[in-house]
Design a protein with these regions (language model features):
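Charged, alpha-helix-forming regions
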Residues: 1-315
C-alpha cells in the first residue's frame, strides 16, 4: 500500500509540474477542417446510379459523335439534351458519374462530409470502371470529361425535392490537378457535379447496380440493364411494349432495327441478373430474373412464365 501511495504521489507531482512547463508537442492543427472538396478514396463501395437517368434517356448509345438535340417526354416528364461541341456524352462516359455517385453514397453511409466537388485518382477510376490503363485510356478519359462538361440538360425532374429550372451542364467543371512525373499522364482530377445530380445523390435517389455492368460492351445492353433495374422492383419478371422500351432507351435506331438489336441482345444473354424474351405476337419484351429460385416461385404462383399478370408496365 505504501509503495502504491508513493507512485500515485509521484504521478500527481509530475502532472502538476507539467502544467507549469511548455505544453508537449502534439498533432499539428487541422488547417482545412472544412474542405470544399470530397476526396474519392474509399476502397470498398457498392455501385450506385441515380434512378432518374436510369429511367429516362440522357446519354448517347453510340460511340460515334452524336450532335443531335434530343427531346424526350413521357407522363409529364420532359428532358432536352443538347450536345456540346464534341457531341453528346455516351453511356460509357456515364461510368465517371456512377463512380463519383458510388463514392459519395458510401461516404454518406459512413457519416463522412461530402461535397459537389470531388477529387479522384485517374488510375483508380480506370481500374474501377473496367478500363485499360494505357495512354489512350487517359486520352479517352479526358474526352469524356469534356463531353460531360459540354452537354446541357433541361428537365423538370426534381431531385431531392428541388427543380432546376435553367439548363445545366452534367458536370460544372473539371481540371487536372496532378500529372505523373514519369509519363506526363493525368494522375489526379477534380470535378464538380451539377447541383441536379448532387441533390439526387444526397437525397439517396439511387439504385444499386451489379458490378458486371461495367463489363457490358454494348451501349444498348447497358441501357436495357438500366431500364430493367429501374422498373424491376422485387418482381421476378417485367413486361414492356417495344414502343415504350424504344422510347425510354433513347436509341436513334428505327423501330424495326431496334427490334433486331433487342433480339440480338436477348440471344447474347449478357445482361447481369436479367434475361430478355421478345414476343413478336404482342410486340412486347419480357425481362425475367436469372435467379432460378425466384423464377420457380413465379411460375408456381402464375402457372406460366408467359403470362403478363403482375409484371406488365407502361410506365
Amino acid at each position: 500500500m505504501a509503495v502504491e501511495t508513493i507512485r500515485l504521489t509521484e504521478l500527481f507531482e509530475q502532472a502538476r509540474a507539467a502544467q507549469t512547463q511548455d505544453p508537449p508537442r502534439k498533432l499539428a492543427p487541422d488547417r482545412h477542417p472544412n474542405r470544399d472538396f470530397f476526396v474519392a478514396d474509399i476502397l470498398e463501395w457498392a455501385l450506385k446510379d441515380d434512378r432518374h437517368s436510369m429511367e429516362h434517356p440522357f446519354f448517347s448509345l453510340s460511340k460515334k459523335p452524336d450532335h443531335r438535340v434530343r427531346h424526350y417526354e413521357h407522363n409529364g416528364i420532359h428532358v432536352v439534351a443538347k450536345p456540346g461541341a464534341d457531341g453528346m456524352p455516351t453511356i460509357w462516359y456515364k461510368d465517371i458519374l456512377i463512380y463519383a455517385v458510388s463514392q459519395l453514397v458510401e461516404a454518406l453511409n459512413q457519416g463522412r462530409p461530402v461535397s459537389r466537388t470531388i477529387r479522384l485518382k485517374a488510375y483508380d477510376l480506370l481500374i474501377s470502371t473496367n478500363r485499360g490503363t494505357g495512354g489512350r485510356a487517359y486520352d479517352l478519359l479526358a474526352a469524356a470529361f469534356e463531353r460531360l462538361k459540354g452537354a446541357v440538360i433541361q428537365t423538370d425532374i426534381r431531385t431531392n425535392g428541388f427543380r432546376q429550372r435553367e439548363g445545366f451542364n452534367i458536370i460544372d467543371h473539371w481540371k487536372i490537378i496532378e500529372r505523373s512525373p514519369a509519363t506526363g499522364l493525368m494522375a489526379a482530377i477534380e470535378m464538380t457535379l451539377s447541383e441536379w445530380l448532387y441533390n439526387a445523390t444526397i437525397g439517396r435517389e439511387v439504385l444499386t447496380l451489379n458490378r458486371d455492368y461495367f463489363r457490358l460492351d454494348g451501349g444498348l445492353e447497358r441501357r436495357l440493364y438500366e431500364i430493367a433495374r429501374k422498373h424491376w422492383g422485387r418482381q421476378p419478371k417485367w413486361t414492356v411494349s417495344i414502343d415504350l422500351l424504344h422510347k425510354k432507351s433513347g436509341s436513334q435506331a428505327t423501330l424495326k432495327k431496334f427490334r433486331e438489336l433487342l433480339k440480338r441482345a436477348a440471344g447474347n444473354d449478357a445482361l447481369p441478373d436479367y434475361r430478355i424474351r421478345y414476343n413478336h405476337e404482342s410486340d412486347h419484351a419480357m425481362f425475367y430474373t436469372k435467379d432460378s429460385a425466384a423464377l420457380a416461385r413465379q411460375i408456381a404462383s402464375l402457372g406460366t412464365l408467359g403470362t403478363d399478370s403482375g409484371g406488365t408496365s407502361e410506365l
